[in-house]
Amino acid sequence: MSALLTAAGLLFLGMLQAFPTDRPLKTTCAGDLSHYPGEAARNCCYQCPSGLSPTQPCPRGPAHCRKQCAPDYYVNEDGKCTACVTCLPGLVEKAPCSGNSPRICECQPGMHCCTPAVNSCARCKLHCSGEEVVKSPGTAKKDTICELPSSGSGPNCSNPGDRKTLTSHATPQAMPTLESPANDSARSLLPMRVTNLVQEDATELVKVPESSSSKAREPSPDPGNAEKNMTLELPSPGTLPDISTSENSKEPASTASTLSLVVDAWTSSRMQPTSPLSTGTPFLDPGPVLFWVAMVVLLVGSGSFLLCYWKACRRRFQQKFHLDYLVQTFQPKMEQTDSCPTEKLTQPQRSGSVTDPSTGHKLSPVSPPPAVETCASVGATYLENLPLLDDSPAGNPFSPREPPEPRVSTEHTNNRIEKIYIMKADTVIVGSVKTEVPEGRAPAGSTESELEAELEVDHAPHYPEQETEPPLGSCTEVMFSVEEGGKEDHGPTTVSEK
């Protein structure tokens, strides 16, 4: 019976395996475009959008999709593509650059990073120098604690490299103190020996066996003492070697030679100036600073001088041009006689005589006045530059007159006073007439009193022969009296010429 039950169970399991298991999955993922059927897990997987790549074979959702970046780029925490760093020479790659993790670079073994950078190091440094020993080991980011070696594990002086290291590092810190009961003669040998050692090879130190006459004390083994004092004792005067002999001068292991080498090294270290770079203080060369300061002062001074000189010259030129302009503007213009065209005004020929009222006799006929030249440009008779014909002396009627003084033209308009002669039978009335002078012409000798003068009357009898000639330079009206022929007792006739 039990065997029958077992066979039935196996048959049932075989029937279950015969049914297809992917049929319901296909129907479930077929209508959803964001999922697709997975082959490995036999279920629906999430379809990542374009530009994103799945982080696992069958992503379950958007969390399993990441941005697809170019090679040597990774997706940072913000979901952006970021370039991976490149390991510089002297660095090693600790982690490679992948799609979701950056590349990490670190210093080589035996060095630590003293200037860190993002996923890298900008400057690496050795943990300990050659003369130091490791006290506490460090890592790529933490420095190793180093210390100086102890006196027991000091360098071997028999090695030439160690001797050079000892000479270059230990000698400047040693402060030798000479203690000796020797007299002045023994001390005077020291500079002589130092002078002789300049010619020898002073780079090698020779071990001197300890003796009762020469003892060299070792430096203090205390590492906390930064400055070590070396105390040297000179031998007694009796035990000093004779340096005058050739045998003693050739001994390389003599006490005086060793002492002189130490003193020579100490003297050279004391006389050598300390470099400012070794002490860590900033060094400023005053040469370029002084040069640039001098250049700035020179440029400022020359610029100020040129600016002041330019302003002074400009002011001087402006004053000069202003004066020249004033002189050209107000310069008096000389009027010449022949500068304007002349017009000859002909007077009508009139023949007549004047009868003297007191005697009743006829006087000589009056000759007409000469022709008058007028200035067409001005508009008034310009007679001030024309000589009078009847004014020449009797001896020489053709002798020229002196040229009249030129008139200065102004821009004002003044009233010109001229005398008018009115002839009657027994009286002559003398008065004044106001005339306008054109612009640019100023009458000579005119005053305000003459402009405001009233009419004056003179009752003295005058005749045509006694008339005064018109003044020089008068371009205004000229009036005189004539008597026409055939008429008696006729009033005065006025002839005006303009």
From Swiss-Prot:
PROSITE patterns (alphabetical): TNFR_NGFR_1, TNFR_NGFR_2
Residue positions the entry lists as glycosylated: 156, 183, 229
Tissue specificity comment: Detected in thymus and in activated splenocytes.
GO cellular component: plasma membrane
Signal peptide: 1-18
Assembly and oligomerization: Interacts with TRAF1, TRAF2, TRAF3 and TRAF5.
Name by which UniProt lists this protein: Tumor necrosis factor receptor superfamily member 8
Gene: Tnfrsf8
